[in-house]
Every structure is written in structure tokens, then in C-alpha cells.
């Protein structure tokens, strides 16, 4: 096959998955209808559709949490062994076929240590319940996204911590809002009022009573505690549930809109025409100028999940806002704030903490500019975790080895740098941490007078050269030749604001971040809907991925598939000798190529070679697949093409898509 340069495409994983299962147009329609204020009374048909269930399986499978078992000890791999029809039927039966309606199994409670010494309770549902939750989330998300505030950034598509920090910097520095009201809701996820949440979903026009019943049952799922006893919750939503972040945003969306109604989206602004800036944000300067002559309180909210800050212009406004919001949370959402953690901060004089950063304003000429660091807790935690990992490099844990521990150290360094590079003074913070870590490295990694740190080692990858190639602090482990990434080699990144034009559920908004498939989508959908008989769901799902990854072409000949009957999915290592349905063990080829891979009869081989007319490169690919399938390679220069002594073909070739 001639070397063909494939065009570079923008790709968002969950959007690509929706394309594979032909659900994107349905989600777009739900989003548009929600924006128009329509009422949704019959969502269960979409939720329990075959395509949505199989899409949910794919989305869960790509999540690392899918390997974590619940109380039933099952993982996503156990679901993958069933056929697509069996999975679809099982989900429908769980939701609708039970005698007393949907009854989720108990949630496994696991306590995760927090930096302050307390624990965060994590609830892990059973895998089938996770699949049900994912089905619901996929359908509810576009409906809710159309109604959510632009000032919330947590657990939402195309929004991130970076966007929240950028909004905070902008409001402090450019808008001159120097008073930050810090709020801390006491045990938010454990204190969500179930009845209030259902009413909030109803107000978002989600009025399918069967769906609301299922959500209520999810909220009231029994919890199996670590000591073995079972609790039946009357409030709260379990952290760890797939649908919990979406429900948390539904709860606090009411707060977002209430804060916005006080100033940012006050009806006064409707009397003024406004334009949009380059990011798609409305320019409302004339309206705000007029509003400052009223008694309205100027305030802006920046929220990431249950962590939010409200920025005000004056101390009086900030004090009033603290009292009003505390009272509103209590009366409307039945949530309490923590008095010792809720305060007003003048960021010109002291730091305000948000999302692991401590932020303030410092004087520069006649203006104030943002100055930020890692917060103190994060600083101590990072230093302690890296120092501990250095000890693991010296004494590797069982099954990891020195190289494995070094790679883990490097991944920790990159993760820390990627997150905290949004701080303006990150180079100072990481420089201080680096001095401590480097001292520990030098002391720990030496044997007598021999140091195990060298200035030369293995060749760096392209990414490593780009990121650390110019650093004079880069060192290598003498034995494994693995590099140790320098924690102090990092510079500040200017946080980017969320682009308002970006939207996962409109064609124009998607075009900013995602390109449509450039393959035969009609054939792809045929492949998705083609019966797989006794084949597993994992096999059927991976087959779709392969069609996209191979650009709709045969892996051997490079020819485009023209119809569904041409497509055969070949197991590189046949299942009869221990092969699996995993992605890396599958490849799509033309039907005659599949026959040729498994053929052993000389006349059959000659017949297919004559028909296919393979060149040297294609024959090499074919022989590689024949070798993996325990077939002798084909040698065109010998009278006998192969030395196989038996005739016939395996059952493998009889099974197409």
C-alpha cells in the first residue's frame, strides 16, 4: 500500500464515541429542544435504546474506574464477554423488568484519605448499576447543559480548572473586584436533599416520571460500609457514582442563576444593546455603568463543583453577600456552610485559596496584578509525596522494579507541573520543592562513594526533548538509564478562558474542537448494527474502533471497503489458541484476504493470490498475520508455496462480521 499521509484531525473522545453509535444527532436534538424550553416526558425510550446502552458500555470501558469492582465483584470485562443483545436485554430488565421497579444493588463504601487527616467517603456502585447510570447521564447531560450557567466549570464537557482560574484572574485583575467571599459547604455530597433535587430536575423540564423514579432509587441505594453493616441514606448522593457530578451541578445551578440575577444577568441589562467579544461573551459595559448608580450589589460567581467563590467590588457588598448566600443556601437548598472556612478576603492584603491555588493582587505601578502560588497544603503534600517516591526508587516495591518506580516518579512530576503551572509563581514553588527533592535524590541514590545519578542515559523521546531537553538539571539512573524529570524545570502558563462558542451539542460549537469522521459513515453504521450472533460486546465494540482507525480500509491491501459483506474481523492470535477479543488482537481485512490468512491448501492459496495480486509490502503484512495464526508464510519463489501437510481452512474464516 503506498504511503499515504493521513490528515490530522481534531478529536474529542466522547464525541467520537457518539458518532460511532449514531447518537450525536439525538443528543443535538435534546440540547436544542431544552434551549427552546420544551418539556421532556418520555426519555426512557432513548435511555434504553440499543445504541445508547452500547455507547454507555464503550464510555465506561474507556474509563480507568471500570476495573474497580462493586459489591458484586464484577468488572466491565465481565459485561464485555456477553453479546450485545444480552447486554441490552439485561439493562432493560434491570430498569423495567424487576417486580418492584428498578432496585440498585448496595454501593461499596471506601474511605479515601484527605490531606487534613480526614477521609472522603467514596461510593462504588456495582458495574451493572454504573452502566444504567451512564445510560441516564448521556441523555440527561445535553438537556441540562442547555440550562446550566456559564459560570460553573466542574464536571462539564469542554470546561476545566484552567477556565475557572482564568475567570478568577480576570475578575480580580481586569474587573477590579478585590473582595473574595470564600464559601465551604459542609459535606455537600452527603447532604443533598433528595426531594429538592427531584424538584430541580422537574424545573429543568425533565418530567419523565419513570426516569425520576429511577433517579430517586439511585439516590437511595443502600451503602455497604467497610465494617460490613448496611446503611439506607435519606439524603446525599454518593461520590463515585457516574451520575453524581451531573446531579451536583443540577443542585447548585439554582445558586448560579440566583447570583447572576443580582447583577450579571439582572433584567436591567435587557434595556441595553450589547455586542460580543472575540470569545463570544456579551459586552455589557453600558448596562453595568447604569446599574452602578442603583442599589444593586455587584457580584460574580466562579464555581467548580461544590467549591465556589463570589467576587465583589466593596467590603460592604462582600459582607452582605456572605450573609445573604449563607441564608439562601440554608433556606432554598437546605445546605449549611462551615463558619470557620467561610470568610471575606481582601486579595490586596492576603491570599484567597481556590482549587489548590492561593491567589492575591500585588501593586505594580498604579495597578494591581495577580500573584498566585500553590496553596500551602498542596505544597507540603507535593514535597512529601515526591520525597517518599524517591525512597521507592532506592527500594523498589514488589513487582515494579527500579525503572517502574522512576516512571511513576516522572508521571507524578508531570502531573504536578501540568496542574500548578497556572500559578504565576510556580517556578518559585517548584524551585523550592526541587532543592529538597534533589538533596534527597543525591543522598538516597548513592552506594558508598558511587553516585547512581548520571548526566547521560537512554535517548529521550520527542516529548521529553521538547519539555526537558534544555534542562541542565536532567539526570539519569545509572543502571536503568531512565531519566528523572526535574520538578523545578517549569514555567507559568497563562490560563485560557472558556470559549463560549464551543459546544458539544451544536454543529458550529463542535467544529471548534472536533472534526467529523472522514470515512464512510454509512458503512460504519451498518457495521455497528450488523448482527454479531454469539460474538462478545467487546468484539463488536472494538470492530467499530478498527474501522475508524483503519480509515475504512483493509489492513493488508489498503483498499476501501465497499459493502458490509467485504469486511471480515480477524483475530491475530486465534481464540482457539488463547486469543482474545481485545482491540490489539483484532484487525479488519477483506473477505478473500481473511480466507488467505487461514488457507493451507496450495490450490486455494494460488487462487486467492491470483485474484488479489498482492505486492511485496502487502505480502509481508499477510505473512505476518499468517505467522501469528500459526500458518506457514507464503513464499512465491518456491514451487510449494507452504510446507503444510494438511488441507482445508479453519472455522475462523467462516465467521465474518
Region spans (language model):
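Extended C-terminal regions of large enzymes
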Residues: 433-436, 443-534, 613-618
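Right-hand nucleic-acid polymerase module
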Residues: 2, 372, 376-455
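Conserved polymerase palm-domain catalytic core
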Residues: 106, 150-151, 156, 163-339, ...
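Histidine-centered nuclease catalytic patch
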Residues: 184, 558-591, 599-608
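A conserved non-catalytic segment of reverse transcriptases
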Residues: 220, 229, 333-398, 404, ...
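Conserved pre-catalytic core of RNA-dependent polymerases
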Residues: 5-9, 18-242, 246
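Short cysteine-rich loop/turn motifs with clustered Cys
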Residues: 537-568, 590-592
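Polybasic, low-complexity binding patches
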Residues: 576-584, 596-637
Amino acid at each position: 500500500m503506498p504511503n499515504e499521509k493521513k490528515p490530522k484531525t481534531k478529536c474529542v473522545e466522547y464525541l467520537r464515541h457518539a458518532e460511532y453509535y449514531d447518537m450525536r444527532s439525538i443528543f443535538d436534538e435534546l440540547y436544542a429542544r431544552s434551549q427552546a424550553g420544551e418539556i421532556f416526558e418520555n426519555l426512557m425510550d432513548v435511555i434504553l435504546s440499543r445504541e445508547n446502552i452500547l455507547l454507555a458500555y464503550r464510555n465506561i470501558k474507556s474509563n480507568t474506574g471500570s476495573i474497580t469492582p462493586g459489591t458484586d465483584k464484577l468488572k466491565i470485562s465481565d459485561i464485555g464477554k456477553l453479546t450485545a443483545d444480552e447486554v441490552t436485554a439485561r439493562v432493560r430488565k434491570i430498569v423495567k423488568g424487576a417486580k418492584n421497579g428498578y432496585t440498585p444493588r448496595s454501593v461499596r463504601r471506601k474511605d479515601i484519605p484527605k490531606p487534613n487527616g480526614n477521609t472522603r467517603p467514596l461510593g462504588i456502585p456495582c458495574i451493572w448499576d454504573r452502566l444504567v447510570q451512564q445510560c441516564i447521564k448521556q441523555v440527561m447531560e445535553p438537556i441540562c447543559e442547555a440550562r446550566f450557567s456559564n459560570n460553573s466549570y466542574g464536571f462539564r464537557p469542554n470546561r476545566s480548572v484552567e477556565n475557572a482560574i482564568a475567570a478568577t484572574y480576570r475578575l480580580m485583575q481586569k474587573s477590579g473586584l478585590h473582595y473574595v467571599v470564600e464559601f465551604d459547604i459542609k459535606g455537600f455530597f452527603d447532604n443533598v436533599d433528595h426531594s429538592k433535587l427531584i424538584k430541580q430536575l422537574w424545573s429543568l423540564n425533565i418530567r419523565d416520571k419513570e426516569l425520576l423514579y429511577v433517579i430517586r432509587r439511585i439516590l437511595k441505594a443502600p451503602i455497604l460500609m467497610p465494617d460490613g453493616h448496611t446503611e439506607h441514606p435519606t439524603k446525599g448522593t454518593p461520590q463515585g457514582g457516574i451520575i453524581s457530578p451531573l446531579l451536583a451541578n443540577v443542585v447548585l445551578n439554582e445558586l448560579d442563576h440566583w447570583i447572576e440575577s443580582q447583577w450579571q444577568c439582572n433584567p436591567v441589562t435587557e434595556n441595553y444593546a450589547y455586542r460580543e467579544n472575540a470569545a463570544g461573551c456579551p459586552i455589557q459595559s453600558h448596562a453595568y455603568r447604569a446599574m452602578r448608580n442603583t442599589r444593586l450589589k455587584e457580584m460574580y460567581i466562579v464555581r467548580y463543583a461544590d467549591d465556589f467563590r463570589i467576587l465583589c467590588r466593596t467590603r460592604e457588598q462582600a459582607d452582605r453577600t456572605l450573609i445573604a448566600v449563607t441564608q439562601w443556601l440554608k433556606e432554598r437548598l437546605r445546605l449549611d456552610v462551615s463558619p470557620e472556612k467561610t470568610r471575606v478576603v481582601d486579595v490586596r492584603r492576603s491570599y484567597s485559596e481556590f482549587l489548590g491555588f492561593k491567589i492575591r493582587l500585588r501593586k505594580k505601578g498604579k495597578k494591581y496584578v495577580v500573584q498566585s502560588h500553590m496553596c500551602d497544603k498542596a505544597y507540603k503534600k507535593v514535597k512529601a509525596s515526591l520525597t517518599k517516591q524517591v525512597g521507592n526508587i532506592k527500594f523498589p516495591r514488589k513487582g515494579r522494579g527500579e525503572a517502574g518506580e522512576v516512571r511513576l516518579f516522572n508521571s507524578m512530576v508531570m502531573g504536578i507541573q501540568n496542574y500548578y503551572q497556572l500559578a504565576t509563581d510556580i517556578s518559585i514553588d517548584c524551585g523550592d520543592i526541587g532543592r529538597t527533592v534533589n538533596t534527597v535524590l543525591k543522598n538516597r541514590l548513592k552506594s558508598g562513594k558511587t553516585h547512581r545519578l548520571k548526566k547521560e542515559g537512554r535517548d529521550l523521546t520527542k516529548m521529553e526533548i521538547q519539555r526537558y531537553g534544555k534542562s541542565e538539571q536532567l539526570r539519569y539512573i545509572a543502571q536503568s538509564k531512565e531519566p528523572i524529570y526535574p520538578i523545578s524545570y517549569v514555567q507559568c502558563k497563562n490560563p485560557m478562558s472558556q470559549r463560549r462558542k464551543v459546544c458539544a451539542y451544536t454543529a458550529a460549537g463542535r467544529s471548534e474542537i472536533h472534526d467529523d469522521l472522514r470515512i464512510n459513515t454509512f458503512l460504519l453504521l451498518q457495521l455497528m448494527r450488523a448482527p454479531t450472533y454469539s460474538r462478545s460486546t467487546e468484539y463488536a465494540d472494538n470492530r467499530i474502533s478498527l474501522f475508524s482507525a483503519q480509515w475504512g480500509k483493509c489492513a493488508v491491501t489498503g483498499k476501501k471497503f465497499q459493502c458490509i459483506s467485504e469486511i471480515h474481523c480477524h483475530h491475530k492470535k486465534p481464540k482457539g489458541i488463547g486469543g482474545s477479543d481485545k482491540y490489539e488482537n483484532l484487525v479488519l481485512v477483506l473477505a478473500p484476504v481473511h480466507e488467505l490468512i487461514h488457507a493451507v491448501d496450495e490450490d486455494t492459496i494460488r487462487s486467492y493470490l491470483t485474484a488479489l495480486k498482492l505486492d511485496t509490502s502487502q505480502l509481508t503484512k499477510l505473512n505476518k498475520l499468517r505467522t501469528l495464526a500459526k500458518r506457514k508464510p507464503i513464499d512465491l519463489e518456491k514451487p510449494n508455496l507452504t510446507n503444510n501437510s494438511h488441507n482445508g481452512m479453519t472455522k475462523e474464516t467462516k465467521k465474518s462480521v
